[in-house]
């Protein structure tokens, strides 16, 4: 895992490289694009705020936070990963059915899942059990 904010670092990485940034209680996951916007490396993601697919400059994605470079998932070539990502342009965002983690995994052709969603569901279930136990 690499932490970076420097543009020269991210231009060396292939399109489809997975990046993440903390947004409060969750981490927003995206991929480096093959494009530039305003001279910056672009990032593609699936965002609740955008209602789905968004391609934006790296600095907008980062929101002043440190970006963690996760690496490259799967074995599909970058051009195929980007094609698969762009196929989801018209799909609506859904926290439970197709969020940023689902999007990245779909694009890479690996099992589609959301580890953060699974963790939150587990914690919610645990809190429910504790609340019931406290009433007894």
Mark where each language-model region is.
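Catalytic toxin/effector domains delivered as secreted proteins or via bacterial secretion systems
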Residues: 55-60, 72-100
């Amino acid at each position: 895992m690499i932490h970076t904010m420097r543009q020269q670092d991210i231009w060396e990485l292939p399109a489809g490289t997975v990046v993440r940034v903390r947004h409060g209680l969750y981490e927003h996951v995206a991929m480096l694009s093959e494009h530039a916007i305003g001279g910056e490396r672009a990032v593609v993601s699936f965002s609740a705020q955008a209602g789905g697919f968004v391609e934006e400059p790296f600095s907008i994605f980062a929101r002043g936070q440190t970006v963690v470079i996760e690496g490259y998932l799967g074995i599909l070539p970058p051009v195929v990963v980007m094609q698969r990502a762009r196929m989801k342009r018209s799909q609506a965002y859904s926290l439970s059915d197709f969020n940023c983690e689902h999007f990245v995994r779909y694009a890479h052709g690996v099992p589609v899942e959301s580890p953060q969603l699974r963790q939150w569901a587990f914690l919610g279930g645990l809190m429910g059990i504790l609340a019931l136990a406290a009433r007894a």
